[in-house]
């Protein structure tokens, strides 16, 4: 059980760090504009060596930002529950901490999937036509890696929960 929780906690830490870095950085998309390279993130866009805040309130950017922030918050909550799962005292007999941590990591995975799906759909259908020479960049890719890490953290914690439940049910009362 502890090895699953340890693996889950490792994946969760890495996934949460990647979520925060992906959300905060400005390299979701790179493109060529007027002969020079430009890149943009969720909060700023940069032309040459100058960066500017994205002041327009565009729905897909707002949705992507919100889902990325919710994902990071769920992952952080899952880490807290995951660390508390190592403690053996049962404060809540009906609430399993590994199960709760796993649910939080799956919620984090869902939120980051929604954010990346929205960003991908709009970028490919709208911005891809506007900028001929463009590509997704490393911040965007970190988001996908974070999705995998939070998903595997959820899997590990669910395995720890199942192992704990099987042992609990097998012991005579």
Swiss-Prot record:
Top-level taxon of origin: Eukaryota
Cytoplasmic side: 1-3, 88-98, 162-173
Location of the protein in the cell: Membrane
Membrane topology value: Multi-pass membrane protein
Gene Ontology molecular function terms on file: structural constituent of eye lens
UniProt keywords, alphabetically: Disease variant, Disulfide bond, Eye lens protein, Glycoprotein, Membrane, Phosphoprotein, Transmembrane, Transmembrane helix
Record keyword Phosphoprotein present: yes
Coiled coil spans: none
Record text on subunit structure and interactions: Seems to be associated with itself or another lens membrane component via disulfide bonds.
Family designation: Belongs to the PMP-22/EMP/MP20 family.
Protein name in UniProt: Lens fiber membrane intrinsic protein
UniProt organism field: Mus musculus
